[in-house]
């Protein structure tokens, strides 16, 4: 019985560890560091640079999620799987991002403005807090 419990715990632990895409996180961390350094700081910017729409726009643009034609919807929604451990949170992330995409991209306006409005919507819905970036203390 003890062996069964131990093996079960190890399987769950392994699943949790490999649920996020470590390679992608390393790439994104490097990009975020560059964007945090290069994006001009405004007086109304949040203290946490990961909640700064301009920093996130910079990072996601470098990853090809935001393009001159708009958002790569599939890639953005799938990003939930790369940065979230809990399956319920992944589902919630995808749902919230989909709602924000529909809300923002159904309105007219310049692509960059709509992309930044999308990030603003996603931040307000609490998607960052679902990711490993929101879990960091």
Swiss-Prot record:
Signal sequence residues: 1-19
UniProt keywords, alphabetically: Allergen, Secreted, Signal
GO molecular function: odorant binding
InterPro entries the record matches: Ant_venon_allerg_soli_2/4_sf, PBP_GOBP_sf, Sol_i_2/4
Compartments, record wording: Secreted
GO cellular component: extracellular region
Superkingdom assignment: Eukaryota
Tissue/organ expression: Expressed by the venom gland.
Effect of residue 28 to V: In Sol g 4.02
One Pfam family recorded for the sequence: Sol_i_2
Family to which this protein belongs: Belongs to the ant venom allergen 2/4 family.
Quaternary context: Monomer.
The protein's name: Venom allergen 4
Lineage, top ranks: Eukaryota, Metazoa, Ecdysozoa, Arthropoda, Hexapoda
